[in-house]
């Protein structure tokens, strides 16, 4: 699920926060954010929220606080677009765990991650989870 309301730098807009808080006020026992990207160059679409940088913490904290005030369990859904991260949005060739023999987004083939890049991706997910915890979310969902 996504609503494409975040800013270009992955920070949350007030509209996006209000949208999700309305869901929580409706009585959902668990409220999960839209997919939030763990790296700047792994976005799957425009208007996607991010959790890759500390500059995103103020909005994430605002969202988590407002969600938690409703009594819902708040989760941030963290992910990387991988082979579905268009070069037209990210400016880099899409990546994957292995070579992809079929053209992906924008008609391009994906590039296989190196071992060091896989380790870096794991660290990006870890950093994003810690950032979400600092913001006040109850947990994360790995997408």
Model-identified regions with their sequence ranges:
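Flavin-dependent oxidoreductase catalytic cores
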Residues: 1-143
């Amino acid at each position: 699920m996504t609503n494409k309301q975040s800013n270009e730098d992955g920070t949350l807009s007030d509209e996006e926060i209000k949208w999700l808080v309305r869901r929580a006020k409706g009585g959902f026992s668990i409220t999960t954010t839209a997919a939030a990207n763990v790296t700047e160059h792994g976005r799957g679409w425009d208007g996607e929220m991010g959790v890759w940088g500390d500059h995103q913490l103020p909005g994430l904290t605002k969202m988590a606080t407002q969600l938690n005030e409703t009594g819902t369990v708040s989760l941030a859904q963290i992910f990387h677009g991988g082979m579905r991260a268009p070069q037209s949005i990210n400016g880099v060739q899409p990546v994957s765990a292995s070579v992809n023999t079929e053209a992906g987004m924008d008609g391009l083939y994906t590039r296989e991650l190196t071992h060091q890049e896989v380790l870096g991706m794991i660290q990006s997910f870890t950093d994003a989870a810690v950032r979400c915890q600092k913001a006040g979310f109850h947990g994360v969902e790995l997408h």
